[in-house]
Curated annotation (Swiss-Prot):
Residues 308-323 have a biased composition (Basic and acidic residues). GO terms for cellular component: ubiquitin ligase complex. Residues 110-193, 299-323 are annotated as: Disordered. Gene3D superfamilies: 2.60.40.790, Tetratricopeptide repeat domain. Transmembrane segments: none annotated. One of its GO terms (molecular function) is protein-folding chaperone binding. The keyword Transcription regulation does not apply. Belongs to the SGT1 family. Residues 301-387 form the SGS domain. PANTHER family: PROTEIN SGT1 HOMOLOG (PTHR45862). This is Protein SGT1 homolog. Keywords: Repeat, TPR repeat, Ubl conjugation pathway. It comes from Dictyostelium discoideum (Social amoeba).
Length: 387
């Protein structure tokens, strides 16, 4: 389990090679853990190892056939491998398990569109060599009578019609391509580099997730929030698709959560269902939260660089330290001296010094005009110090 947690940390930091090493060890130790193979499948997908990713997600489905997110991941991998029929069946299976997840509806629509478009593309590519001049002259060369001439004209007209139809189809395809090109010019792009970066932080009442990508809008993106998960998808300018799917650490109030679109980022503000501290953004195998919100106030999510290990909130409850001997006596002197007037402070200094520390008076009228004589405690004799 430690290897799985360590791999998750590397994965969040986008250190996929290191994460894969940890996931390999986790899959060996936890051979019956479907989540371990799912994590490794995600890591393989990030490293473009699509076949390895598909193998791992199939293992996850064998170990846990009722988890809808495994079917969603498998369908996406099949779609990327252009296995659209398998992808469609997988998405439909996942939708039957979790009908509330709108991501399945989106991917089913995409898969059907690809399946419908593939036959047209294959028929337009294969018939192109058939309308060549070779079949048309055959009736002319085989027949010597002039009567077949109308038939040749018919054949030429049909071939011309076919050519016209093909040209129309090509024109339609070109028109479609131009429309898609016009839309892809404004597709989102990462704010920096080729990877879409994300960050998150929490307050007492909300968890804020930020996706750093430019030109993301409500029309070109799909963001689905449920009480237990967040699903984000939008196409990128390089032709790929950004996907962010995560089961949340603790349930949220999706109705009270908000999504804000900016020119360089998307901010998703999710309201917590209860005032607890989230250890991570993603759900873990640990049952129950770390603690109530009083723990968040005592240990902030972003600690100060000058933070002390002392728990200052508990200071009022700590018993005061009891002083003894000279420390207690000096404390009394300091308290009296700090609160006294200027004459009282002068009287204390004069009486204490002249009496050798045996007399302490705050009455300047009494000690100011005469020398203070030392008064030793009972049973002791006062003697002058001889140098």
């Amino acid at each position: 389990m430690e290897q799985l947690k360590e791999g998750n940390s590397y994965f969040v930091d986008e250190q996929y090679d290191e994460a894969l090493k940890c996931y390999d060890k986790a899959c060996l130790e936890l051979s019956n853990n479907a989540e371990a193979f799912f994590k490794r499948s995600q890591c393989h997908s990030k490293l473009s190892n699509l076949k390895e990713a598909l193998s791992d997600i199939n293992t996850s489905i064998k170990l846990d056939s009722n988890n809808s997110k495994y079917y969603l991941k498998k369908g996406q991998l099949c779609f990327e491998l252009e296995e659209f029929d398998t992808a469609l069946k997988t998405f439909e299976k996942g939708q039957s398990i979790d009908s509330e997840n709108s991501s399945f509806k989106t991917w089913i629509r995409k898969s059907k569109a690809e399946i419908q478009s593939n036959p047209t593309t294959t028929t337009t590519t294969t018939p192109t060599p058939t309308p060549t001049p070779t079949p048309a002259p055959q009736p002319v060369t085989t027949t010597t009578n002039p009567t077949p001439i109308p038939t040749t004209s018919n054949t030429t007209t049909t071939t011309n019609n076919n050519n016209n139809n093909n040209n129309n189809n090509n024109n339609n395809n070109n028109n479609n391509n131009t429309t898609t090109d016009s839309t892809t010019t404004k597709l989102p792009i990462p704010s920096s580099g080729n990877k879409v970066r994300h960050e998150w932080y929490q307050t007492e009442t909300h968890v804020v997730l930020t996706i750093f990508a430019k030109f993301v809008t409500a029309s070109n993106s799909k963001i689905n929030l449920t009480s237990k998960s967040v699903n984000i998808s939008f196409p990128l300018a390089n032709g790929s698709e950004f996907l962010f799917e995560m089961d949340l650490f603790d349930p949220i109030v999706d109705k009270d959560s908000t999504i804000h679109y900016y020119s360089t980022k998307v901010e998703i503000k999710m309201k917590k269902s209860r005032a607890i501290k989230w250890d991570t953004l993603e759900f873990t195998d640990k049952s129950g939260p770390v603690g109530l919100m009083d723990q968040i106030s005592s240990s902030p999510a972003v600690p100060s660089p000058y933070a002390s290990k002392k728990d200052w909130d508990k200071l009022p409850n700590e018993p005061e330290e009891k002083l003894e001997g000279d420390q207690a006596l000096n404390k009394i002197f300091r308290d009296i001296f700090s609160k006294g007037s200027e004459d009282q402070q002068r009287a204390m200094m004069k009486s204490f010094t002249e009496s050798g520390g045996t007399v302490l008076s705050t009455n300047w009228d009494e000690v100011g005009s005469k020398k203070v004589v030392g008064e030793p405690p009972k049973g002791l004799e006062f003697k002058q110090y001889e140098k």
